[in-house]
């Protein structure tokens, strides 16, 4: 069995004002649960969109080994959007309704594919998200931020993707919602990249990758292991600096 993966091959990205956000990034994200960390503004969300194919790199290339589903940290929808649209299943539900009404358009059958039970699967996923009484036609504008995120997460699990990229998925979630998210991430059997500042969520990752102005650096283990490594690196850097100061005084 071939594992899903995402690969960066010498990827650079230049902003509209001509500034290079990052340059020559090369790394591979495999089937392990991976957390992407870094300070605000360093380019984590841009990197996520590059990996998902929503943006094109200024140089280099992104390789996607499988179907990717990307969940932005900004859950946006127009005023007429519904729960089904937010979950990404509205086109299939509409095609299914046309078929059930006697329609025979081949494009509708192509759209439905094997998803004849999509209504039941959506309802089951919404129940797992703690939203059991939420009809698909409910207006998205009536949802709180946490409810909208949970609907979007339901759509992510339903997407049948080989690789999930989740950007700050615990935003707006309460304690119960965060715990449910962790449990689903632990059950997810395929590729996973989570961009987050949530240390409790990152503690369940199998690998941490840090994006900094110097590029990407990979750390095995969860957030605690990463934090220990970074603390040792800072201590070593401080000791080296003190040693150099001492040597200069002796000159």
Language-model regions, residue ranges each:
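Hydrophobic anchor residue at the start of the ABC signature
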Residues: 153, 181
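Helix-to-loop junction immediately C-terminal to a conserved catalytic motif
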Residues: 52
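A short, flexible loop at the N-terminus of ABC-type nucleotide-binding domains that lies
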Residues: 1-8, 12-25
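ABC-family P-loop ATPase nucleotide-binding domains
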Residues: 75-142, 245
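Conserved beta-strand-loop-alpha-helix hinge in the C-terminal portion
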Residues: 80-81, 85, 211-243, 249
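Catalytic Walker B motif of ABC-type/P-loop ATPase nucleotide-binding domains
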Residues: 164-168, 173
């Amino acid at each position: 069995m071939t594992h899903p993966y995402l690969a960066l091959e010498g990827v650079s990205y230049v902003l509209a004002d001509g500034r290079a956000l990052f340059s020559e990034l090369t790394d591979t994200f495999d089937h392990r649960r991976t957390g992407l960390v870094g300070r605000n503004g360093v380019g984590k969300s841009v990197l996520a969109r590059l990996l998902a194919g929503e943006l094109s790199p200024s140089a280099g290339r992104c390789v996607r080994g499988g179907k990717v589903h990307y969940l932005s940290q900004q859950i946006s929808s127009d005023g007429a959007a519904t729960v089904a649209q937010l979950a990404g299943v509205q086109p299939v539900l509409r095609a299914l309704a046309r078929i059930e009404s006697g329609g025979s358009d081949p494009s509708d059958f192509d759209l439905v594919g094997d998803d004849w039970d999509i209504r039941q699967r959506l309802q089951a996923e919404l129940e797992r998200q703690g939203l059991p009484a939420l009809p698909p036609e409910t207006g998205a504008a009536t949802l709180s931020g946490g409810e909208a995120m949970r609907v979007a997460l339901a759509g992510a699990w339903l997407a049948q993707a080989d690789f999930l990229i989740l950007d700050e998925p615990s935003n707006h979630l309460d304690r119960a919602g965060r715990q449910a998210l962790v449990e689903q991430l632990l059950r997810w059997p395929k590729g996973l990249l989570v961009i987050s500042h949530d240390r409790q969520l990152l503690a369940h990752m199998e690998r941490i990758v840090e994006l900094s102005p110097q590029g990407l650096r990979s750390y095995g283990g969860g957030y605690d292991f990463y934090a220990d490594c970074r603390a040792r690196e800072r201590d070593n850097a401080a000791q080296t600096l003190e040693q150099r100061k001492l040597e200069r005084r002796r000159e």
